[in-house]
From Swiss-Prot:
<feature type="compositionally biased region" description="Low complexity">
    <location>
        <begin position="100"/>
        <end position="115"/>
    </location>
</feature>
<feature type="compositionally biased region" description="Polar residues">
    <location>
        <begin position="15"/>
        <end position="37"/>
    </location>
</feature>
<feature type="region of interest" description="Disordered">
    <location>
        <begin position="222"/>
        <end position="338"/>
    </location>
</feature>
<dbReference type="GO" id="GO:0008017">
    <property type="term" value="F:microtubule binding"/>
</dbReference>
<dbReference type="GO" id="GO:0000226">
    <property type="term" value="P:microtubule cytoskeleton organization"/>
</dbReference>
<dbReference type="InterPro" id="IPR044806">
    <property type="entry name" value="WVD2/WDL1-4"/>
</dbReference>
<keyword id="KW-0493">Microtubule</keyword>
<feature type="region of interest" description="Disordered">
    <location>
        <begin position="1"/>
        <end position="150"/>
    </location>
</feature>
<protein>
    <recommendedName>
        <fullName>Protein WVD2-like 2</fullName>
    </recommendedName>
</protein>
<comment type="similarity">
    <text>Belongs to the TPX2 family.</text>
</comment>
<feature type="compositionally biased region" description="Basic and acidic residues">
    <location>
        <begin position="1"/>
        <end position="14"/>
    </location>
</feature>
<dbReference type="GO" id="GO:0005874">
    <property type="term" value="C:microtubule"/>
</dbReference>
<dbReference type="InterPro" id="IPR027329">
    <property type="entry name" value="TPX2_C"/>
</dbReference>
<keyword id="KW-0206">Cytoskeleton</keyword>
<feature type="compositionally biased region" description="Polar residues">
    <location>
        <begin position="59"/>
        <end position="69"/>
    </location>
</feature>
<comment type="function">
    <text>Microtubule-associated protein (MAP) that regulates the orientation of interphase cortical microtubules.</text>
</comment>
<dbReference type="GO" id="GO:0005737">
    <property type="term" value="C:cytoplasm"/>
</dbReference>
């Protein structure tokens, strides 16, 4: 039985070594999460085995080899009851029993323990990690290992040479200062030119105003000559003879001969144009003018004859008309001839 167990232990150890060797060879490749977890579980189990070996060495001195054999048997039987995922944790007591048997043999056990110590450079844990916390620790160790590996690969030492820093802002400040100085000079020159132009314009305006005042100063006499002269002589107005309208005859109509004689006697020396309606009056006047005049007695006799032929109403009317005959005054009112 002891030989078979040793053979089994060696086979498992060889498998574990091959797995570890393959894992180390594949470190350069990107490990998958399943392979990383398996490798971390193996490392934890190996660390636990080393701790168990040290503890069993101290106990193996006092115990006999028969007691080790009796302790190995129930652990071998317990192998069948343990589920497959926890095979690594079940193999721990089995390996411890095989190591105790090898302690009885002597040199073989020391050589195997030395090889294990040489393979594992990590410090020995004094406390066993519980199974329910193992997965969290594996994740933490995987993250730390991956971060350390990437940091080691990415870190490359560079040689830096001490050089004084050169800032572009200093050159910009100098250029800006020069620009502002030039701008201020231009502004000052423009202001000075503006002032000179204003002064020149004022002087020109003053000269123009003085010249205008000289030209506008008139030397006038105190009293003009036309005030001393008298008014011009007035020309006499020409007075034209005024015509007056003839009043209508409202009495009975006379015969043609009577009207002609009456009008001729009343108005002497008048133009016959005023009596246009009497055509025979002008002819009679011509005849009378052609006949030589007799003394006043003949004219009086004619007047008497004419008065006898006219009624009294006609006489009143003739007197009224004779009152309006004559020259008109300044206001156009007729003056009665005396």
């Amino acid at each position: 039985m002891g030989r078979e167990l040793v053979d089994k232990h060696m086979d498992k150890k060889a498998n574990s070594l091959t797995a570890s060797s393959t894992g180390s060879s594949d470190d350069n490749k990107v490990p998958s999460p399943s392979t990383n977890e398996a490798a971390e579980v193996k490392e934890c189990t190996e660390q636990n085995l080393v701790a168990d070996d040290a503890r069993l060495r101290q106990q193996g001195i006092t115990e006999t080899p028969g007691s080790h054999k009796s302790s190995v048997k129930p652990r071998v039987t317990a192998k069948t009851t343990v589920p497959k995922p926890f095979s690594l944790s079940a193999e721990k007591p089995r390996r411890a029993a095989v190591d105790n048997n090898s302690l009885g043999n002597g040199a073989s056990h020391n050589s195997s323990s030395a090889s294990r110590v040489s393979q594992l450079n990590s410090p020995l844990p004094t406390r066993r990690i519980p199974d329910h916390k193992m997965h969290h620790d594996e994740e933490d160790s995987f993250s730390v290992a991956s971060s350390s590996a990437t940091s080691i690969r990415s870190f490359k030492p560079k040689i830096t040479i001490g050089v004084a820093p050169t800032f572009s802002s200093t050159s910009r400040l100098e250029r800006r200062r020069e620009f502002y100085q030039k701008l201020e000079e231009k502004q000052k020159a423009l202001e000075a030119e503006k002032r000179e132009n204003e002064k020149r314009l004022k002087e020109e305006q003053e000269a123009v105003t003085k010249q205008l005042r000289k030209n506008m100063a008139y030397k006038a006499n105190p009293v003009p000559s036309f005030y001393q002269e008298g008014p011009p002589p007035k020309q006499p107005l020409k007075k034209f003879p005024l015509t007056r309208p003839k009043s209508p005859n409202l009495n009975r109509r006379k015969s043609c001969s009577d009207t002609v004689n009456a009008s001729y006697q009343e108005v002497k020396g008048k133009h016959c144009a005023r009596h246009r309606h009497s055509v025979g009056g002008c002819k009679d006047e011509v005849k009378t003018n052609s006949v030589p005049r007799t003394p006043n007695s003949s004219s009086k006799d004619q007047m008497r004859k004419s008065k006898k032929g006219t009624p009294k109403s006609e006489e009143v009317h003739e007197m009224f008309n004779s009152g309006h005959d004559g020259e008109t005054g300044e206001n156009g009112v007729g003056v009665v001839e005396e």
